[in-house]
Amino acid sequence: MDVLYSLSKTLKDARDKIVEGTLYSNVSDLIQQFNQMIITMNGNEFQTGGIGNLPIRNWNFDFGLLGTTLLNLDANYVETARNTIDYFVDFVDNVCMDEMVRESQRNGIAPQSDSLRKLSGIKFKRINFDATSEIIENWNLQNRRQRTGFIFHKPNIFPYSASFTLNRSQPAHDNLMGTMWLNAGSEIQVAGFDYSCAINAPANTQQFEHIVQLRRVLTTATITLLPDAERFSFPRVITSADGATTWYFNPVILRPANVEVEFLLNGQVVNTYQAKFGTIIARNFDTIRLSFQLMRPPNMTPAVAALFPNAQPFEFHATVGLTLRIESAVCESVLADANETMLANVTAVRQEYAIPIGPVFPPGMNWTDLITNYSPSREDNLQRVFTVASIRSMLVK
């Protein structure tokens, strides 16, 4: 894997810097690295593809070295270099695609394609060895079963979940109380509602709670907490739990009271925040518990009192909500996040070449299915294919 990265980095630098008019002295070190790559690759043969509709391609390396010059690089020099660069880039692209479409239930962190296995040989270590990138460093750590650490921006840690629970229900669905939520990606939105605005509740207060268990532990997380859930702030028709009918939800938004957020690890509370909104942090956690209250306003103007009558019918439905958004965090496992396109790259290649469903990944690389059952085998394979996708993105956008 590190050799593949070094190949890509050398080719990217060569493609960007070996251009007509450049002083040779400015790129002499790069050309030496480029020539070392050619010397190492010459005389070797590789084969890629042969899975799904990914075509079999044979690769043979027999290229001349780039020479020296005291002057600027001319058009002939650059054209010769460009022909070599294009062939190598095409080769790296196909090695990456060949690797991205393969999976294994055992040792999925290791190269799975014949071409990448061959590149892992000791003879290729002379190719401008460079393992300074974060993703290569983490791949090497995972390969040695040492602790990794990935920094994510808006990590897709929550499987998609959208539903509701009713704590009070009537056959006519005209006086309900309960909770509804939407968990997806890096965000939780949860709302508590009471059609009667807590008129008969103790102290005219309804208590709500929402617990979310993560599939992986997050550390040093920066989080935004807001006293609102905008996705539940407009009217909607909701299908009943048994699917037999529908009920109407017409929210009027109140501010949640006595808000408490707990971050837990293995059942133990690590961080607690009470009525603190904006930016908060959590050290390490695998569970989030949100609790909040809906309190009937003790004093209301006539206009507000008309919204919340003392008896049915309840045309407007008192609602309070919270939004919790993970802005950044560190995780030992690889995840999709807002800064990367690796999941999209891997999925696109697998779809384009009609790769058959394998023993590890869910059909279509569906992220909710993948993260819901994030097994060690999936973790290993995902880190490998994401690493390869990152390397490929250096050359192919």
Swiss-Prot record:
The keyword Metal-binding applies. Ca(2+) binds at residues 266, 286. Intermediate capsid protein that self assembles to form an icosahedral capsid with a T=13 symmetry, which consists of 230 trimers of VP6, with channels at each of its five-fold vertices. This capsid constitutes the middle concentric layer of the viral mature particle. The innermost VP2 capsid and the intermediate VP6 capsid remain intact following cell entry to protect the dsRNA from degradation and to prevent unfavorable antiviral responses in the host cell during all the replication cycle of the virus. The VP6 trimer contains a zinc ion located at the center of the molecule. The zinc ion is not essential for either trimerization or transcription activity of the DLP. Zinc-depleted VP6 has an increased sensitivity to proteases. GO terms for cellular component: viral envelope; viral intermediate capsid. This is Intermediate capsid protein VP6. Coiled coil: none annotated. The lineage of its organism: Viruses, Riboviria, Orthornavirae, Duplornaviricota, Resentoviricetes. The N-terminus is blocked. Sumoylated with SUMO1 and SUMO2. Sumoylation of viral proteins seems to have a positive role on viral replication. It is found in: Virion. It comes from Rotavirus A (isolate RVA/Cow/United States/B223/1983/G10P8[11]) (RV-A).
